[in-house]
């Protein structure tokens, strides 16, 4: 399992979510529904949370941006390498598997 962010995605998260900020992390989690589905019926989502509030199961760092997945959400991301980029046409995050 790997989460990879493009340079454009790192810049987008930093600008749109005003990260990095103190002890805040970019957390990816699983939600019900959505377009891009690693497992049927569920899709990835993200939020900004305090690092101490997340029971971290996965962590990576991109140019000062801390990216985490909580232990409880690893089941969704396991067995996949997720690539996160920006769809420039609509200025939104896009997901793909590698």
UniProtKB/Swiss-Prot annotation:
Source organism superkingdom: Bacteria
InterPro entries: HesB-like_dom_sf, PdhI-like
Family, similarity comment: Belongs to the HesB/IscA family.
Name listed for the protein in its UniProt record: Uncharacterized protein SSP1406
Organism annotation: Staphylococcus saprophyticus subsp. saprophyticus (strain ATCC 15305 / DSM 20229 / NCIMB 8711 / NCTC 7292 / S-41)
């Amino acid at each position: 399992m790997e989460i990879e962010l493009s340079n454009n995605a790192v810049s987008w998260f930093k600008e749109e979510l005003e990260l990095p900020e103190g002890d805040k992390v970019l957390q990816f989690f699983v939600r019900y529904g959505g377009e891009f589905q690693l497992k049927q019926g569920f899709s990835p989502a993200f939020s900004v949370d305090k690092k101490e509030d997340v029971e971290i199961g996965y962590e990576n760092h991109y140019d000062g941006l801390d990216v985490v997945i909580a232990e409880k959400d690893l089941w969704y991301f396991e067995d996949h390498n997720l690539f996160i980029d920006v769809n420039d046409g609509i200025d939104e995050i896009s997901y793909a598997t590698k």
